[in-house]
Regions:
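Conserved beta-propeller blade signature
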Residues: 1, 73-75, 122-124, 185-188, ...
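Beta-propeller domains
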Residues: 1-53, 92-97, 327-329
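Beta-rich, blade/repeat-based domains predominating
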Residues: 27-30, 54-69, 105-123, 130, ...
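Asp-box/WD-like beta-propeller blade repeats and closely related beta-sheet repeat scaffolds
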Residues: 45-133, 137-140
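Blade-level signature of beta-propeller repeat domains, shared across WD40, Kelch, NHL, RCC1
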Residues: 245-246, 305-332
Length: 332
């Protein structure tokens, strides 16, 4: 989910795009929508509009994307069966089309999760693990629960000739959400450590080099941080995440049945009651250099909070759940 800097549109991935369940039949491809949230009186059919994807026929299994508004560039992570990569699109919000430009494939973009765009040809990306759960399940579990600082943050450039140039600029435990707070500060969630790391960005020495990152500080959260964003209008760092891992795990495993009506209909009453009664908590907070951490929402009414954005000018905030149907919206 992403909020533009000047537009009153919210861009989001369809929250029902897939549950990433091994050996299960894949869901239909992810979809992209634009939501005009400025006028709360508009019905959904007038405010929530599907973006047509043009020139892309492959699988699209996304868990994160980034919109670079000055260049109308949309970067989308893709974990299809063809291998992990990042898809680049040109997004036309007037025509509601996303035209595919290229697939960005590189060995250092191995498990792309979240993206922080610098331009239409440059970005930072988190690879949430060093080991993949599919190829190395035991090592993946050890890396996750021991919070080993071996996963990477990569800096990626698309050169003028189309070559992909990438370098590892930081290593940490479970790098998840990432966002540029300003030109010299990059924030990265460390999910398994319940912290957000703040890195100082040093410019590259020359055109052939990559920028440098130096860890300057961190702050702790009472939940597992997922995605990050910058609040429009006041510049606060927004963080959404998961406060109760056992219920999140149970909820996520159940979605391959509970989110598929055709499967749920064939189950007994006990399973249907289970789907109706399962829940998990959400938490969203903000951080500022002067005020520290302030909590925005914590509760069980809306499940699996993964992203939070806010528009101070229009007095609206939005939380998106990893496995939720719909969005949590508040208005001041």
């Amino acid at each position: 989910m992403y909020q533009g800097q000047t537009s009153s549109f919210l861009r989001k991935a369809d929250q029902k795009q897939g549950d990433f369940v091994d050996s299960a039949q894949p869901d239909p491809n992810a979809e992209l929508y634009a939501w005009h949230y400025e006028d709360s009186s508009l019905p959904d059919e007038d405010s929530l509009l599907r973006i047509k994807v043009v020139g892309f026929e492959a699988e699209l299994r996304t868990i994160g994307f980034e919109y670079h508004e000055p260049s109308s560039t949309l970067f989308v992570t893709n974990h299809g069966r063809q291998g992990s990569r990042i898809e680049q699109f040109n997004l036309d919000l007037e025509r509601l089309t996303a035209t595919h430009v290229r697939s960005i494939i590189h060995p250092l973009v191995s498990i792309p999760n979240s993206i922080a765009a610098v331009s239409d040809s440059e970005f930072y990306v988190t690879n949430q693990h060093h080991f993949t759960a599919r190829e190395h399940p035991l090592l993946w579990a050890v890396e996750t629960y021991a919070a080993l600082p071996i996963a990477t943050v990569a800096h990626v450039r698309v050169l003028e000739n189309g070559t992909i140039d990438a370098a590892v600029v930081a290593r940490q435990a479970y790098p998840n959400g990432i966002v540029l707070l300003n030109k010299t500060t990059l924030a990265v969630a460390a999910t398994s450590k319940r912290t957000v790391n703040l890195y100082t960005v040093s410019p590259a020495a020359d055109a052939a080099q990559h920028p440098g990152l130096e860890l300057s500080s961190s702050f702790w959260l009472p939940f597992l941080p997922d995605n990050l964003s910058v609040s429009k209008g006041d510049g606060a760092l927004l963080v959404a995440g998961h406060p109760h891992l056992p219920s999140l795990s149970k909820f996520s495993r159940s979605r391959r049945i509970c989110h598929r009506p055709e499967v749920l209909a064939s189950q007994g009453q006990e399973v249907q009651d289970m789907c109706g009664g399962l829940g998990t908590a959400s938490w969203a907070s903000e951080w500022t250099p002067g005020g520290g951490v302030r909590h925005i929402y914590a509760g069980w009414d809306y499940p699996t909070s993964a992203s939070v954005v806010r528009d101070r000018e229009r007095r609206v905030g939005i939380v998106a759940g990893l496995y939720a149907k719909g969005l949590l919206v508040w208005r001041d």
